[in-house]
């Protein structure tokens, strides 16, 4: 809106620069989240919209009165900042906002069910998976119709591994959406554990998106160019800004949880950025914490079903370390460090290829 008004009509050249608009979007989203979150917390407490805590985690029972669904606030702040600072005529921006809103809506349905039933189970896995699948399929098909190329790239290699047939690419993108959104959802079990790795991952992906959308940088760095995708940089930075605002209230001890309303939206948007910037494989490194958490659950379930034995004291793995006597803050900060280092290595692939 500001972009169209100040640059389109008044020709204020400052607004033609992605970096300026992305920075402005960051601060708008940050301060809007800071402003709205206390009001949301008061409202949620009045409505008793508290996070049901599993009986299997007795050390977390003191968190049972903490309100959830804080993700609604940072998703809303991101949308406002994006509408103000990004070009809404850009399809990559519109699809990114659809991903944020759509995945957040599925998460909201799940959170609402948990609160109503006072159960940690939420809506049925079949319903949740079905809604996420339909959303992922729609966005993947639209990306294909947009003309996003279907080459599969590996980190540190300048040439693609191969070109996927359209149907295979769409199926692969759906898998990336589903796996990433659920991985972030599984990680969201301790104060700040999902938000900070999401910030690191989004910052890395936003750099890749910016490079992919810039003809000079992509040519110099031998990176695949994606026409018009650079505008998504504005939305990504807005989401990072809103996450910093959310972290202000989510750091230990948390005053609010993001809930599935936030974690599914984050996972979906991270996946979207990885797909449009051709970083589906590199996402495994950038989202290392999400991968580790998900693998711990898969291994735990698989081991118990096949051998009737558990590999970990509890899954996801952050609870395993808690059971071993690690303080919650120690688990959180160490996971943050792993995430930060993983993303620094991932960024090296921009130059080393």
UniProtKB/Swiss-Prot annotation:
The keyword Thylakoid does not apply. GO terms for biological process: cell division; cell wall macromolecule biosynthetic process; cell wall organization; peptidoglycan biosynthetic process; regulation of cell shape. The keyword Cell inner membrane applies. Keywords: Cell cycle, Cell division, Cell inner membrane, Cell membrane, Cell shape, Cell wall biogenesis/degradation, Magnesium, Membrane, Metal-binding, Peptidoglycan synthesis, Transferase, Transmembrane, Transmembrane helix. It is an enzyme of class 2 (transferase). It is found in: Cell inner membrane. Pathway: Cell wall biogenesis; peptidoglycan biosynthesis. It comes from the Bacteria. This is Phospho-N-acetylmuramoyl-pentapeptide-transferase. It comes from Helicobacter pylori (strain ATCC 700392 / 26695).
